[in-house]
Every structure is written in structure tokens, then in C-alpha cells.
């Protein structure tokens, strides 16, 4: 017999425009969270978009600004029920804590009946669910016949992308079935060969009428666990937020700054899941905001759009950029914000065709020296046999998205990547940008080929070894607003006005080549390198002053330093720091050294490339500063806590090792991880610290145990014993 609460819940299924009352939401959430206090974070989960009238968050956590983001959500859908998790690891129930209990509750809630029959697909957890007295089987095929054997199915959604499978699941749920699914949405592009989650995932799309969906966003970076709470903000549901915003605009209750921030965030997350042909949510947002009028504001560095003062404008612009990113290939109009950034193509700039040599053994972005003007349709042609093999055309190098930031100095998402599914592809960008051919990692065995790009604007592109300084004096006159300079180890992207000030591109790119080669060499990664590093200047980046990755992102204010040989030679610290991040590996980087070992690698550039004192790069490593770090450690009651929380204090430890034992000791340490004589690589932070001590002690033929103790670096007694017969070493002043 169904409970009274269940009957109320079912009664709401047929109501199209009424939200579930908060008391009912809390009652249903309480069932799912019964006996659950917390859930460990599994992997790197992403947020769930929530907008349905019968949808609600199950588990969430606040971001740095206190805005709640859901990692799991539930919804009623016709006669059935759906639960989604932002990572597939949650489906197996094996993360510890109250995880198993949570999944037991999820099955019971989704089944809405006693002793449900449970089917698992892509989830290795038969024994766990049997322990909870469910009748459990695995199944392989998603179709009407297979699904009919179960009351609830738990499905790893990562690879379930066909529309037919999605339709089968949707019909199953509408008929009364329970569906529990999860996937790593932000990784879908990688696992699917470059496809877009909102467009290409048939199952995620099929469940959208329930009003919840997996998104391609990431979140929860610093989180360790999710606390179970029966009461969560109503405004986590985008429909609730849209309704509240509309009521405020119509003279109803005013929203607090916190409510507006929560609501706009919920709408942005929900919009991230929407394919371009699904207009319900978009229409509701536009209705709530009213006509654009004065709201049509273009963000700039001088006049940014802030969360506190420009919530409505940010909602509108954020929605526009999400829709434009997924819009059909042709017929995309230029967005007004493109003129502020990345910039307008000069009037009268010629449109040309270019033949681009593509080397499939070099994955990532292949520069073309061409630019797509905002709103222009470009055509890309590649050999027929390579169509639909994972190659793509990218428009724009400014790949950071800014939706999560409280301040926007440009539109939050301005690049596009479109798969080359056919031999001829037409596409356009509302913002414009440099054009690239994207090469998938799996294409390494393909033969080199030529791609043709038509209706593009010539852009300055200098290639070391192919162009010389005299040729550059002509190349830099090309009209596109963005330019690139390249060598086989690194490519820089900067405003053309900055590039035109360069008169010695050969010297500049030879220098950059040496920087990357030096870091490759000291870290034993020369043979690993498959593609050049990239550094892109942007008016606003997603995190920090600069950040690592592909590409490394820097502010446009740093572009002149990046492209001026004299400035780069000193100080250059930030660039070497970020390239160093890209060279970090887990074997030698443990808790507290994420911002340290990259600096060790970066400092090596001063010695090997600049041929200067390698301690001149930063004021926090001068002799006086290092003395202060040492004194602080001496006085600390908890040396380890100080050491691991202050990067330049920790860096002083490494500096002492280099000063005494030379850079060759660091080289041997990093190379030792490929030397079987040193044993297997570490698998945990405890092992990494132990092996740091043991390997370095053996390399230097000194017992570094007392040195580690002086700095407060915890190592095991076994590790200390292993090096105890060596002569101890301690630097002066310690």
C-alpha cells in the first residue's frame, strides 16, 4: 500500500506548472537520506542540473561563495522515478561511510515498492546490493524486453548514448520503472571522441522531461564529503528560481543577494544541460527577465558584469553563450560582445582559403594561421577517409569558461569545437577566433594529410625554422586580431597588436624552445612529449593570475612580457611556474607540494637556460627570505602543518638540497622512478614522502633523515632505518 506522502507525490506528477511544496520535497528527501549522515566524494564529480516541477536535490555542497550545488538529484517522471549522480563511482555503493545505506535507500525510493527486482548495467556491485536483500541481476542490452525484468535499474550512463536506448529507458520510467544513473559529465567529451554531452548523449536527453540532467560542468574540487541535509534551498531548482525572479520583476517579494546568487547559479547549471533544440527553459528565463532593453550589456574589463549588481544581465548573457556554443553550424550571427573580446576583424579584411598540413602524431590543436570572423561561416574540408574519426575544427583559443566567477570581464564562453563528421563541414562562431584543426589522441597512426579551410581571415603565425625575422615583418601585417608564434615545444597566442611589436621572433621562440626542453630534460619527460605546450593570453581567465593546463592561460597584461625576449629573461617566474605545473607528476608531488615541485622545475630554467643565479626569480626565495622561512619552522609547534601550507617555506627545503648536492641530484631523483633498482613507484602520499627520503639519501650518499625531521616532513621509521647507515647531513643554520 502506498503511503500518504507517496500519493501526494503522484498527484503532483500531472501538474505542469506547480512546484512541489517545500514540505513534500523535504519529506521525500528524508526518505532517501534516512540513516545517512555523509557521503564521501568519489572521483571528480560534477553538478546535476535541476529544473523540473517534480525534481529536487538529494545531496549538495556549498561552493566558496556559499552557493549550494547538487551532486545528486531525484525526480518523478510520469509513473516512475529517476535519481542521477554526478559521478558513476557512486552507483556501486562502495565509497565507504554511509554510501551503501544511501544506495539502499535510493533503490527503495526509485522502486516505490517492497522487495524490488534490481538490474545493474556497467556497475560491479551485485554482492553489495544482495547484502541488502535485493534480488539482483546484471543485464547487457537496454531495450524494452530487458528493462521489463526489473523494478529498478542502476546504469553507468557514460557510454549509453544512442537515442534508441534513451527512448527505451524513458518509456520504462514513464510506465512506472525506477532509474538510477550516474556518469562523469565533464569527461564525456574525452570518452566519446569529442562529442558534446548536451547534444550527443541519447539517454541524458531522453530523461530531460523529468527535469534533471547530467551536465558537463565540474565542481567540488576542495570537497572531501557531502553532508546529508533534509533541508536545502528551494532555489537550487531552476524553475523555482525563474518563478521567484519573475515575481520580483512583477513587483513581488524582493530577493536577497544570497537568493539571487543561488537562483542564478541553479539556472546556469540547468542551462548547461540543455541541447539547442530544447527551448522550454530558455523561454521561461526570457519571460522572467522580460525584454532585453537596458539589460543588453556587454562586459568589459573596465565595466564587468558582477553577480551582485547584474544578475539579470548575467543570466541572459550566460544563456546566450550556452545556446550559441551548441548552435547549428551555419547561420550564427555575430554577438555584440565579440567586439569587446576577442575583438572585431578590421573592415575590408580579405577572406581567403588555406591548405593546412596536419600531422596526426601531434595531438591537440593544429594552428592554421587563419581566423574566423564573428558570424562568418567557414568551411573545413578533409579527406573522406578521416571524416567522423574524431577530428574537429576549433574556433577560438580562449577556452576558459567563466560562468562560476562573480565577475565577468568578457562573455563567459566564447569558443566552439565542432566535430568533422563529414568530409566537408560548415560552421560559424558568434565571437570569432583563431581556427585550429583538433587532432584526437587516438589518431597517432594516421598518415599526415592536408585540410582546407575556406572563408577565413589571414592571421599572423610565425613558425620557428619555417619563417625568419624578415618574413615576419610581412606576416605580422595580416589583419586578424589574434596572432601566434610557434616552435615545436611551445606556441604562444596573443593580440596581434602585441605581436606586431616583436622584431626578433626567431630569438624569442628559440628561447621558449630551450625553456621547455630544459624542463623536459630535468624531469625525464623528453620522450613523453607528444605536442607543444601552449600559452594563451586572455582578458580574464577561470582561476588565478595564471593557470596551467592545455593551454596555459595568462592575462593579456602579461602578453608583452611573454613576447619580449629581454623581459622574459628576467623575471619570467610565472611562466616557468605554470610550465612546471605541466611537468609535475604524482611520484614526486605529495600533499603540500602542489605549488612547490613545479617551482623547483621552474627554477631550473634560470640555471640551464638563462645562465643566471637561479635564486633571483622571486622575492620569496632571497637569502633573507629563506632565513625567515627557516626561523619560522624552528619556532613552529607543528612544523609539518606550517611546511605543507606555505609553499615558499617548503621550497626552501628543496633549495637547500640543490645548493648542497647540485641540480644533478634532482635530475637523478626524478629519473630514479624509471630505474628498477630503486623499486616500485609510490602509491600514496606516505610512500611518496618515504621514497623522497630514501631515494634522495641514496643518490646523495647522505642520511637525510635528520634533515627531514628538522623541517617536520613526516616519514616512517622504516624509511629512516633504510638510510641510517649513511652519514647524516644538515645544512648550516638548521
What would you call each of these model-derived segments?
Residues 19-29, 41-50, 60-71, 79, ...:
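Helical hinge/lid and interdomain linker segments adjacent to catalytic or ligand-binding clefts
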Residues 472-473, 481-659:
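Catalytic cores of extracellular degradative/oxidative enzymes
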Residues 66-78, 481-484, 696:
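Short, surface-exposed beta-strand/loop micro-motifs that present aromatic residues
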Residues 219-220, 226-336, 481-500, 509-512, ...:
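Activation corresponds to long, low-complexity, non-globular regions
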Residues 283, 293-344, 349-353, 685-734:
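Beta/coil-rich, acidic/histidine-enriched accessory regions frequently appended to metallopeptidases
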Residues 13-15:
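N-terminal signal peptide c-region/cleavage motif recognized by signal peptidases
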Residues 239-262, 268, 492, 625-719:
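Active-site-proximal alpha-helical
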Residues 327-459:
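Beta-strand-enriched, solvent-exposed domains that form extended recognition/catalytic surfaces
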Amino acid at each position: 500500500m502506498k503511503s500518504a506522502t507517496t500519493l501526494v507525490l503522484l498527484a503532483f506528477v500531472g501538474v505542469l506548472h506547480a512546484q512541489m511544496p517545500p514540505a513534500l520535497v523535504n519529506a521525500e528527501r528524508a526518505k532517501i537520506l534516512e540513516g545517512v549522515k555523509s557521503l564521501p566524494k568519489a572521483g571528480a564529480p560534477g553538478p546535476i542540473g535541476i529544473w523540473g516541477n517534480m525534481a529536487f536535490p538529494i545531496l549538495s555542497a556549498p561552493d566558496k561563495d556559499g552557493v549550494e550545488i547538487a551532486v545528486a538529484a531525484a525526480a518523478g517522471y510520469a509513473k516512475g522515478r529517476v535519481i542521477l549522480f554526478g559521478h558513476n563511482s557512486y552507483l556501486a555503493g562502495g565509497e565507504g561511510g554511509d554510501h551503501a545505506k544511501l544506495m539502499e535507500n535510493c533503490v527503495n525510493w526509485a522502486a516505490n515498492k517492497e522487495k524490488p527486482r534490481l538490474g545493474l548495467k556497467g556497475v560491479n556491485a551485485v554482492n553489495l546490493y544482495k547484502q541488502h536483500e535485493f534480488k539482483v541481476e546484471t543485464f547487457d542490452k537496454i531495450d524494452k524486453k530487458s528493462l521489463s525484468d526489473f523494478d529498478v535499474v542502476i546504469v553507468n550512463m557514460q557510454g549509453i548514448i544512442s537515442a534508441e536506448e534513451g527512448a527505451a529507458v524513458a518509456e520504462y520510467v514513464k510506465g512506472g520503472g525506477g532509474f538510477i544513473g550516474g556518469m562523469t559529465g565533464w569527461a564525456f567529451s574525452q570518452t566519446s571522441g569529442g562529442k558534446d554531452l548536451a547534444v550527443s548523449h541519447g539517454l541524458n536527453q531522453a530523461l530531460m522531461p523529468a527535469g534533471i540532467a547530467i551536465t558537463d560542468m565540474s565542481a567540488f574540487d576542495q570537497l572531501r564529503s557531502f553532508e546529508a541535509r533534509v533541508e536545502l534551498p528551494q532555489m537550487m531548482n531552476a524553475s523555482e528560481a525563474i518563478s521567484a525572479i519573475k515575481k520580483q520583476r512583477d513587483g513581488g517579494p524582493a530577493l536577497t543577494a544570497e537568493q539571487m546568487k543561488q537562483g542564478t547559479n541553479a539556472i546556469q547549471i540547468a542551462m548547461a544541460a540543455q541541447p539547442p533544440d530544447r527551448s522550454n527553459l530558455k523561454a521561461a528565463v526570457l519571460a522572467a527577465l522580460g525584454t532585453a532593453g537596458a539589460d543588453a550589456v556587454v562586459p568589459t574589463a573596465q565595466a564587468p558584469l558582477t553577480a551582485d549588481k547584474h544578475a539579470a544581465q548575467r543570466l541572459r548573457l550566460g544563456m546566450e553563450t550556452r545556446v550559441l556554443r551548441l548552435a547549428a553550424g551555419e547561420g550564427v550571427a555575430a554577438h555584440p560582445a565579440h567586439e569587446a573580446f576577442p575583438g572585431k576583424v578590421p573592415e575590408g579584411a580579405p577572406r581567403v582559403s588555406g591548405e593546412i598540413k596536419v600531422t596526426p602524431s601531434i595531438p591537440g590543436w593544429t594552428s592554421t594561421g587563419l581566423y574566423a570572423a564573428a558570424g562568418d561561416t567557414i568551411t573545413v574540408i578533409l579527406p573522406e577517409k578521416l571524416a567522423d574519426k574524431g577530428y574537429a575544427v576549433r574556433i577560438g583559443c580562449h577556452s576558459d569558461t567563466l560562468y562560476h566567477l562573480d565577475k565577468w570581464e568578457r562573455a563567459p564562453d566564447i569558443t566552439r569545437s565542432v566535430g568533422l563528421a563529414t568530409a566537408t563541414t560548415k560552421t560559424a562562431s558568434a565571437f570569432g577566433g583563431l581556427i585550429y584543426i583538433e587532432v584526437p589522441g587516438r589518431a597517432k597512426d594516421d598518415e599526415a594529410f592536408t585540410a582546407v579551410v575556406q572563408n577565413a581571415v589571414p592571421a599572423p603565425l610565425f613558425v620557428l625554422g619555417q619563417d625568419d625575422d624578415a618574413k615576419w615583418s610581412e606576416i605580422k601585417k595580416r589583419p586578424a586580431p589574434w596572432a601566434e608564434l610557434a616552435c615545436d615545444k611551445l606556441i604562444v597566442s596573443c593580440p596581434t597588436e602585441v605581436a606586431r611589436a616583436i622584431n626578433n621572433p626567431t630569438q624569442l621562440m628559440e628561447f621558449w624552445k630551450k625553456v621547455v626542453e630544459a624542463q623536459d630534460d630535468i624531469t625525464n619527460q623528453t620522450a613523453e612529449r607528444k605536442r607543444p605546450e601552449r600559452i594563451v593570453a586572455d582578458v580574464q581567465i577561470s582561476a588565478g593570475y595564471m593557470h596551467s593546463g592545455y593551454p596555459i592561460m595568462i592575462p593579456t597584461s602579461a602578453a608583452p612580457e611573454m613576447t619580449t625576449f629581454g623581459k622574459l629573461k628576467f623575471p619570467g617566474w610565472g611562466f616557468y611556474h605554470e610550465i612546471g605545473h605541466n611537468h609535475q607528476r604524482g611520484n614526486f608531488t605529495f600533499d603540500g607540494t602542489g605549488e612547490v615541485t613545479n617551482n623547483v622545475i621552474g627554477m631550473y630554467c634560470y640555471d640551464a637556460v638563462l645562465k643566471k643565479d637561479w635564486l633571483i626569480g622571486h622575492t620569496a626565495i632571497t637569502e633573507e627570505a629563506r632565513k625567515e622561512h627557516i626561523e619560522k619552522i624552528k619556532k613552529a609547534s607543528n612544523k609539518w602543518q606550517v611546511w605543507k601550507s606555505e609553499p615558499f617555506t617548503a621550497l626552501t627545503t628543496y633549495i637547500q638540497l640543490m645548493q648542497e648536492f647540485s641540480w644533478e641530484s634532482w635530475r637523478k631523483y626524478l629519473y630514479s622512478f624509471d630505474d628498477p633498482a630503486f623499486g616500485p613507484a609510490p602509491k600514496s602520499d606516505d610512500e611518496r614522502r618515504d621514497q623522497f627520503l630514501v631515494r634522495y639519501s641514496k643518490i646523495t650518499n647522505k642520511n637525510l633523515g635528520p634533515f627531514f625531521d628538522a623541517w617536520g616532513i613526516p616519514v616512517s621509521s622504516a624509511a629512516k632505518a633504510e638510510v641510517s647507515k649513511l652519514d647524516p647531513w644538515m645544512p648550516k643554520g638548521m
